[in-house]
Amino acid sequence: QSETGNIETYLNNIIDNAPGSSGNQYTAPNNSQLNDWNAIIDFLLDHNLASARTKANQLNYQVTEFTDTSISPNQIFYVLEKESTSPNYWGTYVFSKTPVRNNLIIQAPHIKYDTNTGKQAVYCFKNTLARAVFLSGTHRCNSTNFSSCSGTTSVCSSSSQSYKTSDMAHNVTTMFQKTTENLFSNISNSVFIQLHGFGKRSSDP
């Protein structure tokens, strides 16, 4: 599959249509799926789209070769995204074919809530031509299940509770974490920048 246009517009549309704080659409991948996913990332880093697409299809994902015609010269991106009917909301992972900053990876684990951080990550990715950008697949509170993270938060309820499995910053058995580990191992001197937001209290300056 191939697309042309503006990568920022394309990814912002994915963010806008991602599931919100309710619905329980996020399901955790199993070990076999995590291993298959790791192979997909290997193929993408090697620019082997045919093998990446074959393996991605088995997980109800697809690889879109996206040509951004708003950049001069035009830039090609590999977009690993869920198929439209896929039940697997594991996130969207975009790789630059010819990055300017080969070791820079930008991440947005809370595309819906920390407000605007998903779209800010996309903007930074496009304008730096970083190696990759990771976008979570749902609102951080989408799942009803809790992760094994030792911390607690009140972000999903009025009282403090454990983090949800749909919170990519607080769950290590995810495609988000697996992709992070892969790129950390395979890209020399890799730098990961993860965008977060914080609430402002009336007492804050």
What are these regions (language model features)?
Residues 1-205:
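N-terminal catalytic or cofactor-binding beta/alpha core of small enzyme domains
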